[in-house]
From Swiss-Prot:
The name this protein goes by in its record: Malonyl-[acyl-carrier protein] O-methyltransferase
Cited HAMAP family: BioC (MF_00835)
UniProt record, GO biological process: biotin biosynthetic process; methylation
Catalysed reactions, semicolon-separated: malonyl-[ACP] + S-adenosyl-L-methionine = malonyl-[ACP] methyl ester + S-adenosyl-L-homocysteine
InterPro entries, per database record: BioC, Methyltransf_11, SAM-dependent_MTases_sf
One MF term in the entry's GO annotations: methyltransferase activity
Keyword check for Transferase: yes
Organism encoding this protein: Escherichia coli (strain K12)
Keywords, alphabetical: Biotin biosynthesis, Methyltransferase, S-adenosyl-L-methionine, Transferase
Amino acid sequence: MATVNKQAIAAAFGRAAAHYEQHADLQRQSADALLAMLPQRKYTHVLDAGCGPGWMSRHWRERHAQVTALDLSPPMLVQARQKDAADHYLAGDIESLPLATATFDLAWSNLAVQWCGNLSTALRELYRVVRPKGVVAFTTLVQGSLPELHQAWQAVDERPHANRFLPPDEIEQSLNGVHYQHHIQPITLWFDDALSAMRSLKGIGATHLHEGRDPRILTRSQLQRLQLAWPQQQGRYPLTYHLFLGVIARE
């Protein structure tokens, strides 16, 4: 696992908080796919772990659940609170949840655990706070995501410009000893140009790099090279994510 600077991650998402939802197409599509995998029953107590601005917290609250919205980023929780998205708001780390054991019917975490330093620890914590017969439902990104971004940057420099995500077999190793179902699904978003595609990453706070960031500003010539190197289809610029969707049944 890469060393993870939680303060830097929280700061990156904090900067994106006010404009997060307008860039959150990936999160919405991912949530819809995970909802389709969930056992169809009533969930009365829900943890939204990595809640962001509270879109899914509001979804569960509208279905009459008692919702706890948890996020590493205080500005994200401010956005969630302004929307009256949850019943309780909690600043906290998924790898060390400040919550009692066996509290929730559902621990929901959509595109958050990829920011954790140790996936096994994060999943164990989500499992811990779920009651017997409850469910942990999560999505994360897997190796092979953002191939267009990686390809385009190779025309400019050799530095990493997006995090490397775990391969599916390593994610499954983190699920050893529990009953789970999983599915891997690609999602491709389309943009008018390469800059818009990259701005979508910044707009959801996903520009933090575990290895550190090159502070230099992108020059006009670099942007032109990126634009030319980015694979296109009919004049549109794709950005592809590979999702791992998992549903764990608590015994």
